[in-house]
Amino acid sequence: FSKSKSLIAKREIKPKYFKSIALRATIERGSLQGIDPSNISLSLGSNLHSVSYPIDNRGQFNFISILRKKLNIKELSDYSLFEKKDFISSILSEISKQVDSNIIKNLKDIRCFPVFVSSEVYQPINKNTFLIGDAFFSFPPTFAQGASQSIEVAHELYKNLENSIGEFNHERIRRTKMIDQKSKFNYFVFH
């Protein structure tokens, strides 16, 4: 979660734990039986959704699972928890109840992360300061929108500066709130 917003606001802006864990790994195309390698694959489960998609031309895929999971304050403050083999194994065990065991046993470079989201849209006081990406607003992970939002917003900012249009922040806040609502609805539907 970006600390840029807190630095610019001159106050601590804390993210909100979204009661979810993201598991990210890589997997070879041959281990993804029944999945079209030329498309993004989305699987929905109970309190779980998984996505796999190609990342190169050599047959490597990213595998992402978002698992609904409550953690207490002690667990959330222990950043090393998400690197511990026991914790990762417990997350894999929960995911394996709904994902093909052939996929689970062939995952490589497995990492876990807590999912944090923004609870408010922060608008910098200085009109010449623009935040983009997670520094502006962190969405729930249902649209794979992080990178796409950053690219889209960077382009909109460029156009705004090029044409001296002053509507950038107003329109962006409206759009951010709409995307956030859709993301939360998708998360509800996916789980």
Predicted regions located by residue number:
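Conserved FAD-binding catalytic core of PHBH/FMO-like flavoproteins
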Residues: 1-100
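Generic secondary-structure microfeatures
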Residues: 27, 56, 67, 96, ...
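Conserved mid-domain beta->alpha element of the FAD-binding
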Residues: 86-88, 109-188
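Short, conserved active-site entrance elements at the starts or edges of catalytic domains
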Residues: 101-106
